[in-house]
Regions:
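Central regulatory/effector-binding core of bacterial HTH transcription factors
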Residues: 11-68
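Secondary-structure junction motif
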Residues: 91, 95-119, 184
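Flexible hinge/capping segments at coil-to-helix
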Residues: 71-104
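Hydrophobic residues within well-ordered alpha-helices
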Residues: 54-57, 112, 136-142
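A late-sequence structural motif
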Residues: 26, 165-200
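Short beta-strand-to-loop elements that line the ligand-binding cleft
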Residues: 42-47, 122-131
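Alpha-helical linker/hinge and terminal dimerization helices associated
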Residues: 1-8
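Beta-alpha-beta core module
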Residues: 71-72, 140-181
Length: 200
C-alpha cells in the first residue's frame, strides 16, 4: 500500500529515466501526488528511449518497455500497441505506407517495422522524432500513421488494424527498474507512487 502521509520536511533527490511517451501519459499525475506529499524532494527527469535507458547506470529509478522474453524489473502495466491515424484521413491507403515514429532505438518502432516486413507491406519512415507530441501532431494532420500505446491515442484519431491491411501488434510490458546502488527512503517512496500511478 502506498504511503499516504504528507512529509513536507523529507529532502533529497531522485533521478528517474523514462521514455517520452510514458512521461506524457503517466508522470503528470504521479509527480503531482508525490510533490504534494514531499514538496522539498528534487526530481531529475531524463527522457530517452528504453534501449538507451537500459544502458545507463546513473539513474535511481528507470521506467522502460521490456523486451519480449526477458524478465527484468517490476511489471507496472501491460498495454496494447495499436495503429492509429487521424479521423477523416486515410494515409493507410498510401503506398508505400507513411509512418510517423520515434527515432531509432525504440522498441515500438522496431516491432512495427518488423511486423510490416513480415507481411511484405511496403512502408517509409516519413517522419521521425524523439518527441511524442511532434509525432502526434504529424498524425493529427493526416500525414502518416503511427503505432503507439492505446492509451495515447487522442479523440481526433482512430485505431486501425487488420481491416486496413495492417499487421497485429504485441502488447507492451512496462516495468520499473531500481538501481540497487542508490536506493534511499526518498527513492523507494517515489517508486511506490510510480507503481500506484501506473494502476490508474
Amino acid at each position: 500500500v502506498m504511503t499516504t502521509l504528507r512529509e513536507p520536511h523529507m529532502v533529497g533527490s531522485v533521478r528517474i529515466g523514462t521514455p517520452d511517451d510514458y512521461v506524457m501519459r503517466f508522470m503528470p499525475g504521479i509527480l503531482s501526488r508525490f510533490a504534494q506529499a514531499y514538496p522539498l524532494v528534487q526530481v531529475e527527469l531524463h527522457c530517452e528511449p528504453s534501449f538507451n535507458l537500459l544502458q545507463r547506470q546513473d539513474l535511481d529509478l528507470t521506467i522502460v518497455t521490456r523486451e519480449p522474453g526477458t524478465e527484468i524489473g517490476q511489471l507496472l502495466r501491460q498495454e496494447r500497441i495499436v495503429w492509429a491515424e487521424a479521423n477523416g484521413f486515410s494515409p493507410h491507403e498510401q503506398e508505400p505506407l507513411p509512418l510517423a515514429m520515434f527515432n531509432s532505438q525504440c522498441f515500438c518502432r522496431a516491432w512495427a517495422c518488423n511486423a510490416l516486413d513480415a507481411m511484405e507491406r511496403e512502408y517509409r519512415l516519413a517522419y521521425t522524432s524523439p518527441s511524442l507530441s511532434a509525432i502526434m501532431a504529424v498524425v493529427s494532420a493526416g500525414l502518416a500513421i503511427t503505432a503507439q500505446l492505446q492509451s495515447l491515442i487522442s479523440p481526433d484519431m482512430r485505431i486501425i488494424g487488420e481491416a486496413e491491411g495492417l499487421p497485429p501488434m504485441p502488447s507492451a510490458s512496462i516495468v520499473l527498474l531500481r538501481n540497487t546502488h542508490s536506493q534511499s527512503p526518498v527513492t523507494e517512496t517515489l517508486a511506490e507512487h510510480i507503481v500506484e500511478g501506473f494502476k490508474l
